[in-house]
């Protein structure tokens, strides 16, 4: 089975899963879509200028790692607040929201290419996947690639703990990433 998994939480990532293995991923810490408080991919020349603007390394990391993304536009990392502003028609919120949807759609398309467009499903996970219209807006771009599966919720820590337990019990080997 080949999947594109879109983790839509505080951090955002879009991964290509080919027959049970992650073969590529766009992750908000380094590239791809912005997240709620992370910048995602940035224009290199502007980034270089910012890094040499007198800011310390810690200031630059804090800006792009905790004060960027949707937070830099709307002053919040709460996606429910962002969605409420979008529904109210707040122009700044609508513009930032549309940029997020567009960036995610591009990342999903890129991961489809990685899988040679042999995609069994696109999966939306984590807290932002609770928002129907958000998922619908992304799907408007990518829905022709593969069926959509929504698994909203915050199960990351439980999944990590269960995986560690399987390794400790000898039921699974620890992976190297």
Q: PLM features: residue spans?
A:
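Glycine-rich phosphate-binding loop plus the immediately following alpha-helix
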Residues: 2-3, 11, 19, 23-79
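Predominant activation on well-ordered alpha-helical scaffold segments within soluble catalytic domains
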Residues: 44-52, 58-65, 80-83, 105, ...
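Glycine-rich phosphate-binding/hydrolytic loop that grips phosphoryl groups
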Residues: 129-130, 136, 147-177
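Glycine-rich phosphate-binding loops at beta-strand->alpha-helix junctions
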Residues: 119-138
